[in-house]
Amino acid sequence: MASPTSNLSRKELAIKDLLTEIAKALVDHPEGVQVRAVEGSHVTVLELKTHPEDLGKVIGREGRIAKAIRTLLGAAGMKLHKRFTLEILDED
């Protein structure tokens, strides 16, 4: 079962903070960036939410920015022996 962000290790919190800083650097409305981590036994899902106007900036043309961020998360996860998944949430 998934657990809340408070159970993340210090290194996992650093990765969450890294994602937050990367997203804030990409968007026009950095105050709208929110990252929520949902931890499972073998995977931590990082849910990224941005201002609706900035959604395309974190996805990028043909998903290139999102793919690059996922690559960074994958490399960090290998070092921690943990899998990180990025979900980019849009306003419903």
Model-derived features with residue positions:
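RNA-contacting regions in translation and RNA-metabolism proteins
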Residues: M1-L55, A68-D92
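An amphipathic, aromatic/His-enriched active-site/gating alpha helix that lines ligand/cofactor pockets
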Residues: I65
